[in-house]
């Protein structure tokens, strides 16, 4: 709401206004050069100013030519009004779907036909077994060894935590163990057995 100004021979004034309770405010003098808060322009950094001042079209292109170029660049099979209401990412996704429709079915059919060709049927007709391992399902002994090493490391860490907890209880640093801490202490034997078994296997 803009403030009503009254001009007099002595300068500008904000007119006297009535408060909700019925009393009147005095007219107030406005200093020269004062700009009310509502009329102060909002701060814009240099990037905002740059993009506001940037033209929509490339230099030298007329608006008529730009409209023709936009019509020619439309995606086939999609109405113009549908494209106009979409965001950049939605438009990009639509283009990807179009590409997948053009390329996708052939590659899926090839994969399925290869899988069917490699299948062999047992004599009784009940069991179906693949002739060879499918891609990605090969057994890798190095990954199994790495997995065992990871398990051993985890168990050793848990045992170390149990030992530290036991030392704190013995020294009196922890006066009484909580339910979770007691469960942790109870699992120590099981963890040691599991560690021995893993070390024997490896």
Curated annotation (Swiss-Prot):
GO terms for biological process: exon-exon junction complex disassembly; nuclear-transcribed mRNA catabolic process, nonsense-mediated decay; positive regulation of translation. Its main location: cytoplasm. The lineage of its organism: Eukaryota, Metazoa, Chordata, Craniata, Vertebrata. InterPro entries: PYM1, WIBG_mago-bd, WIBG_N_sf. Residues 142-200 form a coiled coil. Keywords: Coiled coil, Cytoplasm, Nonsense-mediated mRNA decay, Nucleus, Translation regulation. Residues 54-73, 86-143 are annotated as: Disordered. It comes from Salmo salar. One of its GO terms (molecular function) is ribosome binding. This is Partner of Y14 and mago A.
């Amino acid at each position: 709401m803009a403030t009503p100004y009254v001009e007099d021979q002595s300068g500008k004034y904000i007119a006297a206004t009535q408060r909700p309770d019925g009393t009147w405010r005095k007219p107030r003098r406005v200093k020269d050069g004062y700009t009310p808060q509502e009329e102060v322009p909002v701060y814009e950094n240099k990037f905002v100013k740059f993009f506001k001042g940037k033209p929509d079209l490339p230099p030298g292109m007329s608006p008529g030519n730009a409209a023709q170029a936009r019509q020619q660049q439309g995606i086939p099979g999609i109405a113009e009004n549908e494209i106009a209401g979409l965001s950049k990412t939605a438009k990009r996704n639509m283009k990807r779907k179009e590409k997948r429709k053009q390329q996708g079915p052939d590659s899926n059919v090839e994969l399925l036909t290869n899988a069917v060709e490699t299948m062999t049927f047992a004599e009784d007709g009940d069991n179906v077994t693949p002739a060879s391992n499918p891609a990605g399902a090969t057994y890798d002994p190095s990954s199994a060894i790495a997995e065992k090493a990871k398990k051993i490391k985890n168990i050793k860490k848990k045992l170390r935590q149990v030992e530290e907890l036991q030392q704190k209880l013995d020294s009196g640093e922890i006066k009484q163990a909580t339910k979770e801490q007691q469960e942790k202490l109870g699992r120590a034997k099981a963890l040691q057995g599991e560690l021995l078994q893993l070390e024997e296997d490896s």
